[in-house]
Amino acid sequence: MSHHATSNPDWHGWLCDTLARLREPWPTRWPGLPVVLDACAMQLWRDAEPASEDAQHMLSLARAMTALIETHNAPMPIEPHYHNRLHTADALVSVCGLLRVLQAQGHDTPETWMACLLLAVASHDVQHPGGANAFAQQLEHQSVQVFQELAQEHQLASVWIDRVSQLILRTDPTLVSANHDRVAGRAFVMDLDWSTVLMNEADI
């Protein structure tokens, strides 16, 4: 996932190349979601750890979540066709790319919100059985329950548990249009509403 800095980076080319390289080892030589997550973190923090304690905590929890997903999904004879580990990896890479574009454009991207997004994306389809919701946010609520149990074990601050939970719930496809309407005409600022839009765009 390396990218050489240029005056006009080819972000689309970077994303397409990275997504293609994720597919080369899938599924028989899959390196694991923790490897993908760490590669994204290296891109965003330039090979360093976040300075903020909250961001460190969320990144650590994201690593625990990706490990949990691997433990749950790897033994499956067949994973869900779409909501599988490759999809989660695609979404992680995509939100990483969006954050890097924002950084390159000079936007303020607080590391707490970057870590929050990585954690939310890592968690948004945890133990997804495949298929679609029978009612609004059905499967998203299931993912939130798994996330909250792990977050409480890791003693994540309640404000970030709430924010990550909201981000996961807002990935219900029927809410995407309303999520985008919520920021229409607003300047970009890293908050829950704009982070929701970034997450929706990454959830390809």
Regions found by a protein language model. Give the residues of each.
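Short alpha-helical scaffolding segments that buttress acidic/His motifs in well-ordered protein cores
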Residues: 62-73, 117-121, 164-172, 198-202
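Non-catalytic interface/linker regions that flank or bridge core catalytic/transmembrane domains
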Residues: 1-77
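Inter-helical turn/loop segments and adjacent helix faces that build the functional surface
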Residues: 102-109, 133-134, 149-161
